[in-house]
Amino acid sequence: MAQFFKAAPTNSIKNHILKNIKVEKLDHRGRGLAYFQNKPLFIDGALAGELLEVQIVESKKRYSKGKIKKIIKASELRITAACPHYQECGGCDLQHLNQAAQIQIKSDGLLSLFQRFAKKVPQQLEKPIIDKAWEYRRTARFGLQFDKKNKQLKMGLRRAQSNELIDQKVCPVLLPELECLIPPLKILLNSLQCKAHLGHVELLYADQGAVVLLRHMKTLTSPDLQLITAFSALQKVNFFGQASSNQSVCLAGEANLSYRLPEWDCSLSFTPTDFLQVNSDINKKMVSQAMQWLALEKNDSVLDLFCGLGNFTLPIARQVESVVGIEGVQQMVDRATANAQLNNLQNARFYQADLSGENLIEQEWANQNFNKVLLDPARAGALDCLAFIAQKKPSHILYVSCDPLTLARDSQVLLDKGYKLDKLGLLDMFPQTAHMESMALFTG
């Protein structure tokens, strides 16, 4: 059979330098938007109104991407980034703006997406939920790369759009209790006999203090364990190891971890591999706002989808007659059930279900009458379970989202089913980045 090959285009503009490019506005991801050859040109780190010299790094049929080579005319909003790694690190992308400007960009982006994907858009957003702009992250994962030539282990976040690690020295968005561990942790990891067989290291913070989780592909030796024990005692951290399985093992320090939601007198146990909201202060405010927007009453029966450890479920249980939490992973269901027992909440029950499946109505819990629903899905959204939710005809549907694009898309479905978008608001869960958390209330 004859084979035909299409020659690569000879007019590719990749790596070309463009001068006097004017940025028109920012998109919902905080990227500068300009136009070149009648198609969008997205520029990381650019601000509206700026005049730039830009290098094309990617050219597609419908759009191009560029990076700033020189700022010819800077925006009045541009500030100097606080982190010395900002120009090379892929972790943050809005440090060149103050917090108020970041909030405005995210708010504008959220409204813009709803204007594109939803029929009815609120005239304005609810007051945004904000807190500290720095020193807020209670979780972080650092990559580890072993250099065979110099026998050294590099620890750091990845460069933007790259698998290469930076040589991390500081990270000012981390809680101070975690950031201060970066230098001594690098020394420890480079002292281990198994340093050529490490995957990544995670830092997190619990009520029991700082936690280190080390992913290792080779069994830790006795000398390695001794070094880890000494490090744990000196730095006052809880140290966990994770081999090939997903199970983590406490190597030194406190094995039982938890965090509190004091407003509702709830304590939630977790393991280092469980999902946690990265911003503890915003998380507490988020739970509080969710409870207010749902207008919970004592006789309510609430369904909490994508419930995780019970971050929303347990506080809700303090206010209502009954609440059912649904999660896709059985281990998380077991953890949430244990958390309900720990908090002496008899009116909270948890079940495992594939929330992307089509047979939700056949589940044993699905025949209950729920008058209010809360859902907090991953970035992919909750498109597959919206028909089931609407079928239950709840008076309130509260949707918490970490991706405004899928929230706007899913909102269209609920609006088409007769629900009204009653409230829409931004939660600044991730300052210094373009990522946003948002909350929408639908009533019917």
Curated annotation (Swiss-Prot):
Residues 11-70 form the TRAM domain. GO terms for molecular function: 4 iron, 4 sulfur cluster binding; iron ion binding; RNA binding; rRNA (uridine-C5-)-methyltransferase activity. Keywords: 4Fe-4S, Iron, Iron-sulfur, Metal-binding, Methyltransferase, rRNA processing, S-adenosyl-L-methionine, Transferase. [4Fe-4S] cluster binds at residues 83, 89, 92, 171. One of its GO terms (biological process) is rRNA base methylation. It is an enzyme of class 2 (transferase). The active site is at residue 402. InterPro entries: 23S_rRNA_MeTrfase_RlmD (IPR001566), MeTrfase_TrmA_AS (IPR030390), MeTrfase_TrmA_CS (IPR030391), NA-bd_OB-fold (IPR012340), SAM-dependent_MTases_sf (IPR029063), TRAM_dom (IPR002792), U5_MeTrfase_fam (IPR010280). It catalyses: uridine(1939) in 23S rRNA + S-adenosyl-L-methionine = 5-methyluridine(1939) in 23S rRNA + S-adenosyl-L-homocysteine + H(+). Disulfide bonds: none annotated. Its EC number is 2.1.1.190. S-adenosyl-L-methionine binds at residues 277, 306, 311, 327, 354, 376. HAMAP family: 23SrRNA_methyltr_RlmD. Catalyzes the formation of 5-methyl-uridine at position 1939 (m5U1939) in 23S rRNA. Belongs to the class I-like SAM-binding methyltransferase superfamily. RNA M5U methyltransferase family. RlmD subfamily. This is 23S rRNA (uracil(1939)-C(5))-methyltransferase RlmD. It comes from Psychromonas ingrahamii (strain DSM 17664 / CCUG 51855 / 37).
